[in-house]
Amino acid sequence: MKPSIHSLTHQTMQEWVLEQGEKKFRADQIWEWLYRKRVQSFEEMTNLSKDLIAKLNDQFVVNPLKQGIVQESADGTVKYLFELPDGMLIETVLMCQHYGLSVCVTTQVGCNIGCTFCASGLIKKQRDLNNGEIVAQIMLVQKYFDERGQDERISHIVVMGIGEPFDNYNNVLNFFRTINDDKGMAIGARHITVSISGLAHKIRDFADEGVQVNLAVSLHAPNNELRSSIMKINRAFPIEKLFAAIEYYIETTNRRVTFEYIMLNEVNDGVEQALELAELLKNIKKSSYVNLIPYNPVSEHDQYSRSPKERVLAFYDTLKKKGGNCVVRQEHGTDIDAACGQLLFNTMKRDRQKAVAAVNP
């Protein structure tokens, strides 16, 4: 199975070109064809020799993904199901924001973090995506606009799809390098956000990288007892260890951290939890921001329901009065399989049902 050419960073593409006995500038030409002109085959790279094109075809594919289901929401959100070369499935989401076009990418097939409210956790981790498979999600969504002759470009990326990005650390870092490269898609690092669940040692590593990508942490509870009950990762990385790493990140990078807090009715959305959260954040108040997220119900997690508006507003008001920076996140795609992992899980469930029906007609 040949890898995608998108698996190469600009640097490793230069190294590959030199290994083929070509001049280094050929890497820039290939890079421009891929990310500026966004061709779909090596044959379209008309300023390359036939010999180099043959080597590219022999060793790489351009696009490693096949497009499957596409769901479009009334609010402009588009959810894609892509098939990987080994037949496994992933999902990607396009969101039309007031500030531009934002794409949410997946980094793993399935997820082992096991958050008890999340559809992604219903799909056990099968493998990591390589850099090329993550980059290809962006390129295929951009193709959606290119083919329509629309002069629109993806401007923002959120790494919040299925999987824990820092459990696939090196591939995710190479994805950032590729998509941020100023000779390619040139999506600014500050327009990219990576959302993680709390691998504290990786937060420290990320701080030392000097990458300008925004960091978001899935917190969802203000104390260890509650967080451990809904996020099993907290048993390995309790809040004390997590916040020590976050404080190191803030001190090292001088950058703000966003905390994601999903609102689960009568679980974590009370005024008492808002007060606990304010206390937890008091030492990093000026360097933190809280995203209050309305819950998209998942039928397999029917122990949870969406917080009523009045409870969300009471939580928000309490946090604001204590000096917290927070916002209630705008919803997208509520009329489709909107929750992370929901489209993929529902597709897999339907496929299983069809298989059972075929065996037991």
Curated annotation (Swiss-Prot):
UniProt key word Cytoplasm: yes
PANTHER family in the cross-refs: 23S RRNA METHYLTRANSFERASE, RADICAL SAM CORE DOMAIN-CONTAINING PROTEIN
Gene3D superfamilies: 1.10.150.530, Aldolase class I
Keywords from the named record: 4Fe-4S, Cytoplasm, Disulfide bond, Iron, Iron-sulfur, Metal-binding, Methyltransferase, rRNA processing, S-adenosyl-L-methionine, Transferase, tRNA processing
Family, per entry: Belongs to the radical SAM superfamily. RlmN family.
GO cellular component: cytoplasm
EC number: 2.1.1.192
Location within or outside the cell: Cytoplasm
Binding residues for [4Fe-4S] cluster: C111, C115, C118
Cofactor(s), by name: [4Fe-4S] cluster
Anything else known: Reaction proceeds by a ping-pong mechanism involving intermediate methylation of a conserved cysteine residue.
Active site feature: E91, C340
Textual note on the cofactor: Binds 1 [4Fe-4S] cluster. The cluster is coordinated with 3 cysteines and an exchangeable S-adenosyl-L-methionine.
Record's catalysed reaction(s): adenosine(2503) in 23S rRNA + 2 reduced [2Fe-2S]-[ferredoxin] + 2 S-adenosyl-L-methionine = 2-methyladenosine(2503) in 23S rRNA + 5'-deoxyadenosine + L-methionine + 2 oxidized [2Fe-2S]-[ferredoxin] + S-adenosyl-L-homocysteine; adenosine(37) in tRNA + 2 reduced [2Fe-2S]-[ferredoxin] + 2 S-adenosyl-L-methionine = 2-methyladenosine(37) in tRNA + 5'-deoxyadenosine + L-methionine + 2 oxidized [2Fe-2S]-[ferredoxin] + S-adenosyl-L-homocysteine
Covalent S-S links between cysteines: C104-C340
Residue ranges constituting the Radical SAM core domain according to the UniProt record: 97-329
Primary location group: cytoplasm
The protein's name: Probable dual-specificity RNA methyltransferase RlmN
Record function comment: Specifically methylates position 2 of adenine 2503 in 23S rRNA and position 2 of adenine 37 in tRNAs.
PROSITE patterns according to UniProt: RADICAL_SAM (PS51918)
Species: Streptococcus pneumoniae (strain P1031)
One of the protein's GO biological processes: tRNA methylation
Entry-linked InterPro entries: Aldolase_TIM, Methyltransferase_A, RlmN_N, RNA_MTrfase_RlmN, rRNA_lsu_MTrfase_RlmN/Cfr, rSAM
